[in-house]
């Protein structure tokens, strides 16, 4: 049963195969379920890109989508997450996509349910499909990971994107640097080295900006965000000093003129909307891996 909970569970070869499948889907290869198959999407946190790209991926694969609303479900009556998943399994769901505010919510489920769990983000912990779409975007741009220098900039402490990407990119041979305000550093994330943003600007191949997660902070004021942009954001002046051929990435949603100058969101270096497009293809590949009996299995030459 091919669940996807964290990037640490994937080998380089497994990452390679997922990316190759995603690239095939991006190039127009089609794959349809061979029988009626239900997949349930459970989002306990707000989401636009992840939720809808999973739904588009499911529908493009010919899967039947069950969209779960916590507000109108028995969760409001005290039903546990485990009982909810077992209920969906009992009525015919063959896989579940879950986003949850609790770090590692899946620990209580993974050895108890009989259908694959696809983690769409757990608290401040992991975001494997975001990581995979970022890897696909980088691979399309540079053709490799080995030897690339990548800066992950912003709220490292609260970012599941930073955690998943730093681990996976290190595994694939890239060098990771972090740039962050002191209070948002995460000393438990040992996959990168902290340096100042202005030192990194002319050196790195990828500038990966992180959203300031105001919902996880006590203070979110205009003057504080203006100060953040000046000290830690990608300003127009900083973009002008970036390395030739380097790219800008952001998992979105973007706080314009906070993490990045509004004018740069769709500039020549930006791959922000390309990342979103790649999210559909990566999630198609992840679903195909999770449901081999109805979506088939393909082996590929290594893509890493």
From Swiss-Prot:
Catalyzes the condensation of carbamoyl phosphate and aspartate to form carbamoyl aspartate and inorganic phosphate, the committed step in the de novo pyrimidine nucleotide biosynthesis pathway. One of its GO terms (molecular function) is aspartate carbamoyltransferase activity. This is Aspartate carbamoyltransferase catalytic subunit. It comes from Bacillus cytotoxicus (strain DSM 22905 / CIP 110041 / 391-98 / NVH 391-98). The lineage of its organism: Bacteria, Bacillati, Bacillota, Bacilli, Bacillales. It catalyses: carbamoyl phosphate + L-aspartate = N-carbamoyl-L-aspartate + phosphate + H(+). The gene is pyrB. Keywords: Pyrimidine biosynthesis, Transferase. Its EC number is 2.1.3.2. Belongs to the aspartate/ornithine carbamoyltransferase superfamily. ATCase family.
């Amino acid at each position: 049963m091919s669940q996807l909970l964290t990037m640490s569970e994937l080998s380089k070869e497994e990452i390679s195969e997922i990316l190759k499948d995603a690239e095939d889907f991006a190039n127009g290869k089609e794959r349809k379920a061979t029988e009626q198959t239900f997949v349930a999407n459970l989002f306990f946190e707000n989401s636009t890109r992840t939720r809808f790209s999973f739904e588009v991926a499911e529908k493009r694969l010919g899967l039947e989508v069950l969209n779960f609303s916590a507000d109108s479900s028995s969760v409001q009556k005290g039903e546990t997450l485990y009982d909810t998943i077992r209920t969906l399994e009992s009525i015919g769901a063959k896989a579940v996509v879950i986003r949850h505010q609790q770090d590692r919510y899946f620990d209580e489920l993974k050895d108890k349910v009989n259908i694959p769990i696809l983690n769409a983000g757990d608290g401040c912990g992991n975001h494997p499909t975001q990581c995979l779409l970022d890897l696909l975007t980088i691979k399309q741009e540079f053709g490799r990971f080995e030897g690339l220098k990548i800066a992950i900039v912003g709220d490292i402490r609260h970012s599941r994107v930073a955690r998943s990407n730093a681990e996976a990119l290190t595994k694939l041979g890239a060098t990771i640097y972090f740039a962050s305000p002191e209070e948002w550093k995460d000393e438990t994330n040992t996959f990168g080295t902290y340096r100042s943003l202005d030192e990194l600007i002319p050196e790195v191949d990828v500038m990966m900006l992180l959203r300031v997660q105001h919902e996880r902070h006590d203070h979110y004021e205009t003057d504080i965000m203006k100060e953040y942009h000046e000290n830690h954001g990608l300003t127009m002046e900083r973009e002008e000093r970036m390395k030739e051929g380097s790219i800008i990435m952001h998992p979105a949603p973007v706080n314009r003129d906070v993490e990045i100058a509004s004018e740069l969101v769709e500039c020549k270096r930006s791959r922000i909307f390309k990342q979103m497009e790649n999210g559909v293809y990566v999630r198609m590949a992840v679903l195909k891996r999770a449901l081999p009996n109805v979506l088939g299995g393909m082996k590929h030459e290594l893509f890493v």
